[in-house]
Structure formats: C-alpha cells, structure tokens
C-alpha cells in the first residue's frame, strides 16, 4: 500500500516540503537584489548563498543526502557531502533564474538554451495532428522548461499544469499567461476536461510526474532499486486523448546554459497505463543519474511525508 494511504484505507494528501519564505514579498526582495547583477555573477552569488543556507538546514540536508545515497551508489561520505552542497547551490542558481525570467517573453528565453535534443519527437507528433503530454520532474529548472517549450517555433499552445502556491499573490506573479502559454492549477475542478480538450486540439500539456498526488490513482514503481509512489494520472489522460507521453527535462550545463531533452513518445493503450508509467520512471531514473545534483526533493522520495490531521 502506498505510504500516503492510511492503515484504514483512508487516502490522505501528501504534504510536500514548504517554508515561510514562499511569499511574494520575499520574492520581490530577492529579485530586486538579483537584478543589479549580470547573470554570471548573479548565479555565482546565488550558489554561494544557497550552499550556506543548506548547511544551516540539517533536516533538509539529511533528506537530500539520503536520496543521493540511492543514486550515487558507492560514493564516499565526502563525495556525498559535496553532492549535497552542490544540490543546494544548484537550487539557488535555478531560483535566481526563475526570479528574472518568470515574466519574460517566451521568445526571449531562446538565448538561454545551449542545446536541445529530441525536438524531432515532438515535431513528428504535432505533424501527425496529435497533442502531447510532456511529463517532467523536479529536476533542473522545471518551471522554465514549460516556457522553453512554448518558445519553439511553430509549436502549438502549451498548457503547464502546476500545484497551487500557498500565497495566491505569489502564484499570480510567477505564472503569467501568454498567447502561446497557459498555466493550469491542478486543483481546479474543470482542469482535466480542459486539458483533454486541449490535447484533442493537438496542443501540448506539460506536467510534473515525480510526486504522488495522495489519491487512489498513485502506483508503486521500482525507482533506484526500491519502490516509490508515482501518479498514474498523466497516462490516463494521454490514453483518453489519444496522445503520447514524452519525458522532458530542462537541465543546466557547465556553461550556465540550459539543455532541453525530450524523449521518445510513449503511446498508451487502454489497460497499458501502468506500463507507460514504468517507462516514464525508467526515463526519470536515467535523467536523475545523469544530473543527480539537479534533483530537488527535500524529503524522502521513497516514503513521502503525509498530513494525517
């Protein structure tokens, strides 16, 4: 039974990591400080600050280290400590970019992309008149990934599905719709029907696929040698729309530019949703193994925290 299902069978919602700084006022203050620096210096300062913050958060540091122990098998204690430091530093760099780029014209974002791989998969799907469900994870700069998809020349409209922020004002600030880009809150009652219609029009839907929802659609899948819960919903949606699922990740290279990787389409037939989920988790495992210090989960992924109140 998934760890977020109570013993009596009652489904409880996972409570993911959150903190009191996730408020618009703090974001505006951080953005004002970041805006005075050129990007290379801004990222460098953000890495230093985030590395220091990580060392002041022992509980979060322990969780990140435990997650990385499963990924970096055979790593020494010193190597694991360095990887934890790098994880916090990378999170700071991506946050600095989010502050400056979240309201930018999607077309302007192309200058930040150094390499793309797998665009041919998307082009073939769209050319055939299908929509596409792009499933990503909390790996790299996932917030920027949806915007980068929208700025592809000739791409159809992209609908980015995200969880609601605790601060509604912050959500309005971070997620600004554009003609080619629309943000959808997962909890909205009409969200699924709207996404289904968009896919049937040949548009793209981008969503997270690495955290369970706490609902009965979650399934346990082998992930780095142990079972973890993942949502089946993206594959149910794709099957209903007759659209494929494509793994998609936006990571940062050493030169500070982003690399966008889109995997081969996973077509989902009726009754094969679980097989599709397993294929997606295998792709996620490969991506995390390639970029372990760009994987941002500050809790035990194999036993996510729950709210039993």
Name these PLM-found stretches.
Residues 49-51, 106-107, 157-160, 218-220, ...:
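A short, structure-level motif marking secondary-structure boundaries and short turns
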Residues 18, 56, 81-85, 126, ...:
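Non-catalytic C-terminal accessory region of glycerolipid acyltransferases
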Residues 29, 63, 120, 144, ...:
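Short Gly/charged-rich anion-binding patches and loops
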């Amino acid at each position: 039974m998934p760890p977020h299902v109570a013993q009596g069978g009652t489904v409880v919602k996972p409570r993911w990591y959150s903190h009191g700084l996730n408020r618009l006022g703090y974001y505006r203050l951080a953005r004002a400080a970041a805006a005075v620096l050129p990007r290379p210096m801004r990222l460098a300062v953000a890495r230093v600050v985030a590395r220091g913050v990580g060392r002041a958060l022992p509980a979060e540091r322990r969780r990140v280290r435990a997650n990385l122990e499963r990924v970096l098998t055979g790593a020494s204690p010193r190597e694991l400590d360095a990887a934890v430091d790098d994880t916090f530093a990378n999170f700071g760099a991506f946050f600095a970019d989010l502050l400056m780029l979240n309201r930018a014209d999607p077309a302007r974002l192309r200058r930040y992309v150094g390499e793309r791989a797998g665009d041919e998969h998307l082009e073939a799907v769209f050319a055939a008149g299908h929509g596409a469900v792009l499933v990503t994870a909390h790996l790299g700069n996932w917030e920027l990934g949806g915007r980068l998809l929208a700025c592809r020349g000739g791409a159809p409209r992209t609908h980015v599905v995200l969880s609601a922020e605790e601060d509604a004002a912050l959500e309005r600030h971070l997620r600004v719709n554009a003609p080619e880009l629309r943000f959808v809150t997962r909890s909205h009652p009409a969200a699924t029907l709207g996404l289904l219609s968009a896919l049937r029009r040949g548009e793209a839907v981008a969503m997270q696929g690495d955290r369970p929802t706490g609902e009965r659609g979650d399934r346990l899948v082998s992930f780095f040698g142990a079972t973890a819960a993942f949502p089946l919903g993206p594959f149910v949606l794709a099957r209903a729309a007759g659209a494929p699922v494509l793994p998609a990740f936006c990571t940062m290279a050493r030169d500070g530019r982003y690399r966008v990787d889109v995997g081969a389409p996973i077509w989902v037939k009726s009754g094969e949703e679980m097989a599709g989920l397993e294929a997606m988790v295998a792709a996620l495992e490969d991506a995390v193994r390639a970029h372990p210090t760009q994987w941002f989960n500050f809790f035990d992924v194999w036993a996510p925290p729950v709210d039993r109140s």
